[in-house]
């Protein structure tokens, strides 16, 4: 949970990421479930995991995906952190590169956990859905619906995620 604000925001945006480890793992299929600056953890747990911070555009996202296999994670359900957006921050000025990096992480996660490989069209729509940008055309909704069905079926077969949480 955190509150995001920026120079052109008429109001603050309250972000509520999942609070449970399983909910966080599911959220990782769609994006990073943490505000990096607000994270606390024991350094010993991190050192014992053997996970290394990778040098990529979405390094925090990849870090949490890697670390989620080694430790239990949670978000505190209170808005205790303010995240300020500004024009020149890396995630804004390098959005295209960061999006490509996040797409690669998501494709790898879908492949390793659910055995899914996305077509180029599915990948484009998946990204558009995750970023909540633009408007999907009517014909894209069919692809979107099919993609969601594939995600559900793949999880039903592999049981990688809690089915009750996965459908909510």
Where do the protein language model's features map onto the residues?
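Conserved donor NDP-sugar-binding/catalytic core segment of glycosyltransferases
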Residues: 1-12
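Flexible helix-coil transition and linker loops at the boundaries of alpha-helical arrays
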Residues: 157-162
């Amino acid at each position: 949970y955190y509150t995001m604000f920026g120079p052109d925001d008429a109001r603050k945006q309250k972000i509520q990421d999942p609070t449970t480890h399983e909910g966080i793992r599911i959220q990782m299929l769609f994006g990073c479930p943490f505000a990096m600056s607000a994270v606390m953890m024991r350094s010993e747990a991190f050192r014992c995991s053997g996970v290394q911070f990778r040098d990529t555009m979405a390094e925090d996202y990849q870090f949490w995906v890697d670390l989620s296999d080694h430790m239990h994670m949670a978000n505190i359900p209170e808005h205790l952190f303010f995240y300020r957006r500004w024009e020149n921050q890396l995630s804004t000025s390098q959005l295209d590169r960061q999006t490509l990096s996040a797409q690669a992480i998501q494709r790898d996660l879908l492949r390793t956990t659910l055995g899914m490989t996305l077509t180029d069209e599915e990948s484009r729509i998946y990204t558009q859905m995750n970023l909540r940008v633009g408007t999907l055309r009517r014909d894209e909704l069919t692809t979107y619906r099919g993609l969601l069905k594939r995600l559900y079926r793949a999880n039903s077969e592999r049981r990688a995620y809690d089915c009750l949480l996965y459908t909510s």
